[in-house]
Amino acid sequence: MNSSHHIPKKIRVAHRIKLERCQSWEEGFHVFDEESALAVEMALATGRPLLVRGEPGSGKSQLARAAAQELNRRFISEVITSTTEGQNLLWHYDPVARFHEAQMLAAEAAATALRQENWEEDNQADSEEIPSVPPQPEALSRKKSIRYKKKKILPQKRQHLFQAISAGAGRGFLPDRGSADLHPGNSISPGPFWWAIDCVSARQQIGRCRWPLYQPGFDLGFSLEEAAAQAQRGFVFLIDEIDKADSSLPNALLEVLGNGGFHVPLLNQTVRVPPGFASPLVIITTNEERELPPAFVRRCLVLHLRFDDEHYLRTWWNRQVTQRADQFHPDRALVKWLAERGELHFEHVFSVRVREKAAELLVRDRREAQQAGLIKPGQAEYLDLLRALRNMAAASSEQQQLALLEQISPYVFIKEAQE
């Protein structure tokens, strides 16, 4: 981009950002270019989700983590699978837990009723008039029988207890608190979208829920005041690999993406961003395994991450023109671009020659894989190769590293079955 273009203000461009360990994510580094930084700022300005397209290993998911760190926002992520349901991103309802609660309450109420019945019988037996003459043997045996009955639950009472437990909440055995304990709201867990939109009401709801089915990847011990302070800063919510699910999942998100909120019928409650709180930055990634519904895509801004795209590489090359004596060539530019990324991730670890050699091997294998219609290695594989080289004791000098690259690169770059 030339100097007349808008320069992002909230995201630092060409800056080495160290990413802290987060949930299951390891430490790492990320570098925003102008295009991705500007896309993030536009998503913030419009309130629209940012759909990030690109091949696997191009840094789509990491972009969301880096954005959260740069914007000082809490990071929430959900990796989509073929079994993920759209509603579960909003809220979870657990009917099994509610049924279990009903059974527990019924058993408790039946046991209370049985204890009351035994107590009344005991009082009746104790209040029997004691005769003025010495008791006869038959009377003694009768009193022993009464004492025996006090200590023993009769078979018909056991049957009465079993029937009460089996009947659940429908037989009138529940105490007064039963109707409140069995409210459907006690079985609803806020999903990740709820936390991202309004973490205060989500914090309240998680305190009400008996058996939460979803927990965000951070400490729930904060107070409502702390939750409100967090809500003012906002969240970054990553929906990772949405193309793993069928079209029902993105279609289930049309309301929340279009309106910025959703309704929970069982609570008769609408979840939306409260006044004064920051709207979430929603970043959605796809590897293009499935086509996304047009109505879903229309609600998103779209960023294409194509690091080997000729137009992108030419733009990057032209910004470096004062430092480059060579004429532009796509493969040569990609090698230089990857070598620069390698230095940003492994600062002062490898020489330029080693980083460029690793990049040349990647570019060669990418071209061969593309011609054969196979999976192409990408930026992630390039960084994995350098990481392995750094950690292998046999590669301490530049010459050793250059020799080892040829040996180990197939383990990283060639992933298809060989005939």
Where are these regions (language model features)?
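C-terminal regulatory/interaction module of P-loop NTP-utilizing enzymes
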Residues: 1-419
